[in-house]
Amino acid sequence: MLMLKADNDNAIIVLHEIYGINDHIKRMCNIYHESGFDIFCPDLLRRDTHFLYEQHEQAYNYFKNNCGFNTTAVEQLVNELKEKYKKVIIIGFSVGATLSWLCSETSQCDGVVSFYGSRIRDYIDVMPRCPTLVIQAKYEQAYNPSHLQQKLASKPMMSFYIFNGRHGFCDRFSPSFNEEESKRAMKLSFDFITKIVG
């Protein structure tokens, strides 16, 4: 687990993509840590190294076969952190975003931010029990985010935003990186989190 601690009052759990704890995830952990949060990023892959972007197929199959969308470990971490911190927020990217979406219903976290969780479309019955921010890319290959937005529109405690980019638009190390939309999405996430922690 990647941990960045400085005796802050609030904690963020960062859930990575299929690639593991790579430079993008480390960068995101640092950004949120520098804004006043202790950071906990569990290695969901439980392997020595992360996958490279060129290993997408291998990374996807590894995640599907060895990890999946079981929220138990994340929920246990939330429970541990709730004993030490005022607020615990989960932020996920891609598959980590789908996991964070699932945790919005089942865990004791205080808020969820989901960056382009494409598999949320398989879990539209989830009913968030905490403030939940869903950030989607407009150009997804496998589905139409606007249709997903319509299906989730009646959910309480949920905000849904579509940004003009492709899957991974907040990842500075990805060909999909969109600096302008990334800045907008990050600001939205910070505004959302600030309201939760007061």
Language model features: what each stretch is:
Residues 92-96, 100:
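Gly/Ala-rich beta-loop-alpha elbow adjacent to hydrolase catalytic centers
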Residues 128, 134-136:
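Short beta-strand/loop motif that positions the catalytic acidic residue
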Residues 27-28, 143-152:
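Short alpha-helix in the alpha/beta-hydrolase fold that links the catalytic acid
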Residues 102-106:
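Active-site signature of alpha/beta-hydrolase-fold catalytic machinery across serine-
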Residues 108-118:
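A conserved short beta-strand
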Residues 158-198:
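C-terminal catalytic histidine-bearing segment of alpha/beta-hydrolase fold enzymes
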Residues 82-93:
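Alpha/beta-hydrolase fold nucleophile elbow
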Residues 1-83, 171:
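Serine-hydrolase catalytic machinery in alpha/beta-hydrolase-like enzymes
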